[in-house]
Design a protein with these regions (language model features):
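Eukaryotic acidic, Ser/Thr-rich intrinsically disordered low-complexity regions
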Residues: 780-815
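Acidic/His-enriched low-complexity segments
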Residues: 19-288, 415, 430-432, 448
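Sec-dependent N-terminal signal peptides
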Residues: 6-10
Length: 815
């Protein structure tokens, strides 16, 4: 989801408005339906599956032995979730015999009458013979997961050049599309899965591969076993032509399942995993409990990644070649996120989807923890700020973190459960302190391991460790909505500095906030005061012999807030120079970008690459690069900065000047190992020497992704003929979902204006439509204006050419 949210933010920056959707009859009935924990009548104990696949029909043939027991009350019936299956047989197992059972089935649930009344603690095993037909199932997904059919056959007949794969996606309740189960997060079961597949393929599932058997028909049966209980939505199967790249954490297997061409770089993509396992085990005080940890990449995957127990599935955006990795591992946060779920989500699981933030806020916050450990506090704080902005831009002020009222459980996978939840944990860590924070997490994980939990149990763990009543915090942040909007003013009179903080949010709610305030007297000298905001307006006085050079409210920079801070230019200069945190410096640079471009240049020498990049971006927007002293610094960055993205942005700015003195610089860096740097350099050449740039674009087109891919696509599209269609189509198709692909779509659509071949135009607009359809339905109101504009231009051009049928075809795409 995080990837999708960033792309949506990019789209919103293009269109500047949020599309208004016609919705004359709004369904509000759900607002009165309480969604609590699910009644537990029967408990899963063990699930055994034997499956094989029909690749031509995209079917799975399944046999299941599911062992259960009544949760507490005696029962003579069993309800299993089983979506869109053909049921052939249901029986209760008695020794070596099977006794048929009566049942009813509505294509969603099996209601089974058992052979007798079973008492609490009395186990029984039900046998089911069935066929799963996922492609005949129609269910909606969520923002995080765009489909919900559970079992996916990718290129099953080998009709395209794509890899043939099978993979599953269970969350929220989609695994019951390929095996009958009680598909609720509060259920836990051990498991065995036997997969019979063509012998040329490898398989992956939860737990350990305990046996393999070659069969006479050219297939092989792999037996996977998981002895530790986990929830049904975490079950996984993966099948395909993968290379298994071996790694280790201590003596435990840590393997990476990738396509052959990515085997040489698999450890560069996933190789931090063993260190992450060690780091998370240490800070939590709870070792990684599972028997191994594997990661696999799936083509056409419907989410970003999924924490299937011991078998995490990543979308193909995880695939990066050596040149992409020069710019940094774009998938590192996703790797840490899914791994951390093996404590928060897999080991201790949300009791109900209403409490999904217990899984997702922790996984989100793990990204901060890892960034802080591996890349430093500035990098972590930059991520924290980015995630906070992602939440604030989602316009979710009315949503509680724990939501017992919702229309669809899929709607809970949003910027509140993830981003806001992570920020709430960050504030909690700051409030109680590191020692108490991690000790509380250890207690929570220890008390509820292999069990479901809800947010109150997390609170009780924190209260037990800290000795404090934290109901106020949970009520405000977990069971409340919104965030404070602070208006901060300062004055000084008669030896006293005064700070006035007004809470100006329009919800009428007043937040209780512990806040640190630093008062600076001279240079870096400061005194820290800890205060509470708890009124609509709070005023604080600090004795000071002279007017403070800076007063820094929220000195730790941890508050989830919207802020209007009325500092002067001189105070922001002091803040940039002496306040230590990433956000201190960023706030100052933001002020300079709007009010004092000459001071903004200070950010070009910042120790942190992210702020150097931020400075360059704002100098570009404000044309501050035209100041001679600033331009001199940018020229130095273009050749010396150790960070490739910063260097690339500097070259991009030089390209805007159309100055021939930079030609040699562009020619030098157009062959750089970084796609970002090479792309920026090629863009510069395109301004100075269009013919040379076109020749180079054609030359480099077979190895052009990211920024270089965007520039190559733009240059060739601008100059392309009808004969270049297949190249441009393939180039566009092969770009991973990203901001660069969206920019390429605009260039590709421009090219289609001059394509005359009807079938080629259809192929092109269909491919653009595929990109649009990768965005979840509920967010398309943000982006459809962009696609409509692209399609409208192409349609008008074809109508002008007299191709009315093609024009009508294009017009129908977004109706």
């Amino acid at each position: 989801m995080k990837k999708i949210i960033l792309i949506l933010i990019f789209f919103s920056s293009i269109i500047k408005v949020r599309a208004q959707q016609d919705n004359p009859s709004v369904d509000t009935a759900w607002e009165h339906i309480y969604r609590g924990s699910y009644p537990r009548i029967n408990d899963l104990v063990h699930t055994k599956l034997a499956v094989s696949f029909d690749y031509n029909k995209s079917w799975m043939f399944g046999k299941e032995w599911v062992t259960l027991q009544p949760h507490f009350y005696d029962t003579d019936s069993l309800t299993l979730d089983a979506k869109g299956m053909e049921i052939k047989e249901i029986a209760v197992v008695k020794g070596k015999s099977k006794i048929p059972l009566k049942y009813s089935y509505d294509d969603m649930q099996l209601r089974i009458t058992l052979d007798k009344t079973y008492k609490s603690g009395e186990k029984y095993t039900v046998y089911l013979d069935y066929i799963s037909k996922p492609d005949e199932l129609k269910l909606k997904g969520s923002a995080a997961i765009t489909e919900a059919k559970g079992l996916y056959f990718i290129n099953p007949k080998g009709e395209t050049n794509e890899h043939t794969e099978i993979w599953t996606q269970g969350e929220t309740e989609s695994n019951s599309a390929w095996f009958p189960t009680i598909d609720k997060p509060d259920q836990k079961t051990t498991q065995e899965i036997s997969m019979t597949v063509p012998s040329k393929y490898v398989t992956l599932s939860n737990g350990l591969l305990v046996h393999q058997q070659k069969n006479a028909d050219g297939t092989r049966t792999d037996d996977w076993k998981m002895d530790l209980p986990n929830s049904p939505y975490l079950f996984f199967m993966g099948v395909g032509d993968y290379v298994i790249v071996k790694d280790k954490y201590k003596k435990m297997d840590v393997d990476y399942y990738v396509e052959k061409e990515y085997a040489p770089v698999a450890k560069k993509i996933f190789g931090e995993t063993p260190a992450m396992i060690g780091f998370f085990s240490k800070i939590l005080g709870v070792p990684y409990v599972w028997p191994k940890y594997d990661q696999i990449v799936g083509r056409e995957y419907v989410s970003g990644a999924m924490e299937n127990t011991t078998a995490t599935l990543h979308q193909d955006g995880a695939y990066q070649n050596a040149r992409q990795l020069v710019d940094g591992n774009a998938w590192e946060n996703d790797i840490s996120h899914e791994l951390f779920h093996h404590w928060f989500g897999d080991l201790v699981t949300t009791e109900s989807w209403s409490n999904i933030t217990l899984n997702e806020s922790f996984a989100n916050y793990s990204e901060y923890l890892w960034q802080q450990f591996r890349h430093g506090k500035d990098a972590a704080d930059e991520l924290n700020y980015s995630d906070m902005q992602g939440y604030l831009m989602s316009e979710s002020d009315n949503k509680d973190l724990v939501r017992f009222y919702y229309k669809n459980k899929e709607d809970l996978f949003d910027a509140v459960s993830y981003n806001k939840g992570g920020r709430i944990l960050h504030m909690l860590r700051n409030y109680v302190g590191d020692s108490a924070f991690f000790k509380s997490l250890k207690e929570y994980l220890t008390l509820y391991k292999f069990k479901p939990a809800e947010a109150q149990q997390l609170r009780l763990a924190f209260e037990d460790v800290t000795g404090q009543d934290l109901n106020w915090y949970w009520n405000q942040w977990y069971y409340g909505s919104g965030q404070p909007s602070l208006d901060i003013n300062y004055d000084y009179n008669n030896g006293k500095a005064r700070v006035i903080v007004d809470q100006v949010q329009t919800t009428g709610k007043i937040f209780k906030l512990p806040v640190a305030i630093d008062v600076y007297s001279q240079g870096a000298n400061k005194k820290r005061y800890k205060v509470w905001l708890k009124n609509k307006s709070d005023t604080f006085y600090f004795a000071s012999l002279q007017k403070p050079s800076l007063i820094n409210v929220d000195a730790y920079k941890v508050l989830l807030e919207i802020k209007n801070d009325h500092k002067s230019a001189e105070e922001f200069e002091q803040q940039y120079q002496y306040a230590p945190n990433y956000l201190d410096r960023r706030e100052a640079l933001e002020y300079f970008a709007k009010n004092k471009l000459s001071a903004l240049a200070n950010g070009l020498n910042d120790k942190f690459a992210g702020l150097r990049l931020f400075t360059l971006e704002n100098l570009e927007k404000g044309k501050g690069y035209t100041i001679p002293s600033v331009l001199n610094l940018i020229e130095q960055i273009a050749v010396k900065d150790p960070n490739k993205k910063v260097q690339a942005k500097a070259i991009e700015i030089l390209a805007k000047l159309n100055d021939s003195k930079y030609r040699s610089l562009f020619e030098k860096y157009v062959t750089d190992s970084s796609y970002s740097v090479a792309g920026a350099a090629l863009e510069g050449l395109a301004h100075l020497e269009p013919e040379q740039a076109y020749t180079l674009a054609k030359k480099y087109s077979n190895d052009a992704l990211g920024k270089l891919g965007e520039v190559v696509s733009g240059i060739i599209s601008k100059n392309a003929s009808e004969n270049d269609f297949n190249f441009l189509l393939d180039h566009f198709k092969n770009e991973p979902l990203s901001e660069d692909k969206i920019k390429s779509a605009i260039a590709f659509a421009q090219y289609l204006l001059k394509v005359k071949n009807t079938e080629n135009v259809k192929k092109g607009v269909d491919e653009i439509m595929k990109l649009r359809n990768q965005i979840p339905e509920q967010y398309r109101g943000y982006i459809d204006p962009v696609f409509k504009q692209l399609f409208s231009k192409i349609s008008d051009a074809k109508k002008a050419e007299g191709n009315t049928d093609l024009s009508n075809y294009i017009d129908g795409l977004l109706k």
